[in-house]
Regions:
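Cap/lid segment of the alpha/beta-hydrolase catalytic domain
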Residues: 48-114, 118-120, 291-298
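Alpha/beta-hydrolase fold nucleophile elbow
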Residues: 124-135
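Short beta-strand/loop motif that positions the catalytic acidic residue
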Residues: 246-248
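Conserved small/polar residues in nucleotide/adenosyl-binding loops
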Residues: 326-333
């Protein structure tokens, strides 16, 4: 698309509780922002993706100033020119953000909230922030919504987590990846051979593997509040005043549909404006036909191909963000139809 915007890098400083160890109390969040080419004095809303995959040596991704090929490029080309800013934000312990990868714990949550406030309070911002992302990046919107931040107007979680333990323990069973999710999957994030690597030695980084192993063995929180700290939905229902556009593949074998249903019913019951887009795809965005075909099989969604591909999804997103970020939120419709509860 035409280069109608410029991307710049910023650090957001915030105070970390000293008990978080690592880099506390001096938290620092790394982000990049693209602002559309608009007349001087015009303010615009912000669409932001928060996650661990920007500028991260562990997964060999480019600098955060380059839009992510998985989502950022599409937003820059198809939505930003309509008068939206876009931001990519590294969660704590990843990319150029300091501290440690505490896997969605308190430090990460506080960093997410600080970045939302920063994005909503800049001179070029109209004060409204929307968050979007898939998988890990679809879990950070739930984290942000816990705080009731006045700038957070809408979130679009795509196959995101309402809680970390809820991902891997369900109906009396434990997934094989459960004991190693913290340091086995994300343990190398933020470790790149510089002097800031010492900041990764925060308490939760050390406790995480033992807590995962204990829950795998006994099925519950054996000690402490590691899992309670990483359950988001209860605080969202209590504090959030924005809207939710919830997206979920019903053949997602990574983040199962129980993250979306009956979650959407609980949003309705809490009088939170919500919309759901659920389809017969795997751990994907709704408009990616090649991935949908490659990740499906007979009996696992391929029967619905290509009818389940939503090539109108970016247009749908544009209309959603325009309505929610540029105008006052519509009255909450208490007559929303309910989805059936999951088994």
């Amino acid at each position: 698309g035409a280069q109608l915007w410029s991307g710049t890098h910023h650090f957001v400083d915030f105070e970390l509780p000293i008990e978080e160890g690592g880099a506390a109390p001096n938290g620092k969040v790394s982000l990049a922002v693209w602002i559309p080419d608009v007349p001087e004095g015009t303010t615009v809303p912000v669409i932001a993706e928060f996650g661990p995959y920007f500028d991260e040596a562990s997964v060999e991704t480019p600098g955060i100033e380059e839009p992510g090929t998985w989502l950022g490029t599409m937003i820059l080309e198809q939505i930003v020119p309509h008068g939206f800013a876009f931001a990519q934000v590294s969660v704590m312990g990843t990319g150029r953000s300091n501290h440690c990868m505490d896997l969605m714990g308190t430090a990460e949550q506080l960093g997410v909230d600080a970045a939302v406030t920063w994005l909503g309070s800049q001179d070029w911002s109209n004060g409204n922030v929307g968050m979007i992302g898939k998988s890990y990046d679809g879990s950070t919107p739930w984290q942000a919504a816990m705080f009731g931040n006045e700038h957070l107007t809408t979130i679009v979680p795509i196959s995101g987590l309402i809680g970390v333990m809820e991902l891997m323990w369900r109906n009396g069973s434990s997934e094989a990846r459960a004991p190693i999710m913290h340091n086995g999957v994300y343990g190398s994030y933020g470790i790149d051979g510089d002097l800031e690597d010492a900041g990764n030695m925060c308490p939760d980084y050390l406790v995480g593997p033992a807590t995962g192993g204990a829950a795998w063995a006994w099925g519950s929180e054996a000690a402490g509040d590691y899992w309670g700290e990483r359950y988001f939905l209860d605080r969202v229902l209590e504090n959030y005043e924005g809207s939710v556009y919830l997206i979920q593949g019903m053949h997602d074998w990574n983040v199962d549909p129980h993250m979306a249903i009956p979650t959407i019913n609980r949003l309705y019951d809490a009088d939170i404006e919500a919309k759901g887009l659920f389809g017969q795809w795997d751990h994907d965005y709704p408009d990616r036909p090649q991935q949908m075909y490659d990740r499906s099989a007979d009996g696992r969604g391929r029967e619905a191909f290509p009818e389940m591909v939503r090539m109108d999804w970016m247009q749908d997103l544009l209309e959603w963000f325009t309505c929610l970020l540029y105008t006052s939120p519509s009255p909450r419709d208490k007559r929303q139809s309910r989805m059936p509860s999951s088994a």
